[in-house]
Amino acid sequence: MEFSSQLSELTGIKPIYPDIGLHGGGWHMHGKDGNLSVHMDYSIHPKLKLQRKLNLIVYLEEDYSPEWGGSLQLWSHNYETNKPLKKEKEIFPLFNRAILFDTTQKSWHGFPEKINPPDGKLRKSFGVYYLTDVTSTAEERYKAHYERI
């Protein structure tokens, strides 16, 4: 069974398509003082015109230490201000850990504090995104929306 079919069965999302062009995906590497502001990803793929639905992130730095920072933060949404409301969860970038989450219209995430790994160490991950047909409730956001926390 193809991986996309397994994801569809696991999540109930039908149809589901891999973003084979890796728009916004691929390798993500951050060294000393690197960070990623809390943001919502694009909701509509700018070329394929499909709705972004799932993020799959795999962490690839061996021996990454918690003291260096860089845990992925998942935030709730403030519907009055359309901004992040509260940090709900932190996920440490443990080597070979995979995170799969629904890229909803309000799924704020990032690691806003600067990281502090020693020279030669990076926070490495690989991101792959999955798309579906556009729903009637999808906001048309063709690029990520960032907020400073």
Q: Which residues make up each language-model segment?
A:
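Catalytic core of Fe(II)/2-oxoglutarate
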Residues: 28, 33-37, 41-53, 61-149
